[in-house]
Amino acid sequence: MARRSDHSHEEIRDMVLAAAEHIIVEQGHDGLTARKVASEIGYTVGTLYLVFENLDDLIMHINARTLNRLHQLMTDGETQNLAPEDRLMQLGQIYIHFAYSDPHCWALIFEHRPTDDRPMPDWYAEKVMRVFVIVEETLQPLAPHRTESEISQAACALWAGIHGICILGITQKLGDVGEDSVQNLAKSLIVNYLSGFANYQNQPMMNKHI
């Protein structure tokens, strides 16, 4: 068993996060326990709680790292040079491929429920929102007549649709389909949604039948 002095506070923190992510990838998030993490890094369970408040806090930081990786992929230089329609298609493809490549860490963002009722910290909420901001910024040039709130609503609607297709595909609720089929469904959703979103100009979105 390693001594606490063998590693700095930050080193232990990074070791815990890496070990926890490895367990999630191998066993799913249901397999994650403080005891397993401690065993993997060679420290006591008590050491984990010197760097994280509790298991919920650890999971939130794991989710933050997952969101960071997703954000980095979505802001890759290649996507920023595309036309808005093409960029939205690419963003959808990136999201679905990310989910299929790392399904357990991806699912943990949405499936974990903290044991207390404390609100989401601002630093974590910012990581969630900046993913939506990318979609909002890409949508805006396609419909300059839309208000800021309509753009935000559209970004949420598109994400919800793509996310739903992704969940149904990964959990095999669409039958025995693979990532390619899910990608095609997402493309169809984006094409049809954008057609209505860009062309209906004279009425508020809530009154549209797109």
Model-derived features with residue positions:
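N-terminal intrinsically disordered/low-complexity leader segments
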Residues: 1-11, 81, 201-210
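Generic hydrophobic, amphipathic alpha-helix propensity
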Residues: 12-20, 37, 62-66, 70, ...
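Helix-turn-helix
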Residues: 15, 23-57, 61
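Amphipathic alpha-helical linker/stalk segments
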Residues: 64-88, 120, 129-131, 137-141
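Hydrophobic alpha-helical connector segments
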Residues: 75-104, 129, 145-148, 154-158
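Amphipathic alpha-helical segments used for helix-helix packing
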Residues: 101-119, 167-175
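Amphipathic alpha-helical packing segments from all-alpha helical-bundle domains
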Residues: 118-144, 152-156, 184-195
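Amphipathic C-terminal alpha-helical segment
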Residues: 158-177, 192-203
